[in-house]
Amino acid sequence: MQLSEFDFPFDPLLIAAHPCLPRDHARLLVLQPLNRSLAHRRVDELPKLLQPGDLLVVNNTKVLAARVAGRKRPSGAEVEILFVKDLGDAIWEVLIKGTCRPGQIIEIGAEVSAVVVERGATRTTVRVESPIPLSEWLRQHGRMPLPPYLKRAPTDQDREWYQTLFAQHEGAIAAPTAGLHFTPELLARLQQRGIGLTTVTLH
């Protein structure tokens, strides 16, 4: 079996490159549990689709602006780094586009660089050299790690658009996208309907 067997034709314009406004007007596909039928609805219809006493579990992870452009020293060749996970002691797990060997120094900003520690098929780690914690530097200078299928460059507006209403605990490199469609008005209507809400942190 080839992966290409799962390809199918579709109009790329159907991929939403920007969020629906208002957010809760996004389309929602509903599976009816009794007869297994499908219904096309909208997210703002959730209060009447759920029952009093139901519980919504939402992810309160916050997306870190973890994508940066860098230059290899001394060649100046450009590379892109996505900082995936802080492993402690200034060591980060990363994804790097481009060829890099252990020991390679990548400049990513004034007085900020990453030295490749391990470069493997499934894992790459770097040691960050920075006068301030990298997470703090990324908040100021990093770009939001938009999904590649959006095929557009991130904007300053994405720092707001690509966070959910529940975002509290920084650490994600991708938004829990279902949560992007909730608004304060929708939450108020769910609460009035007697629908509970609890949070988990997954990133």
Model-found features: residue ranges?
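A cross-family signal for N-terminal binding/gating loops and helix N-caps
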Residues: 1-203
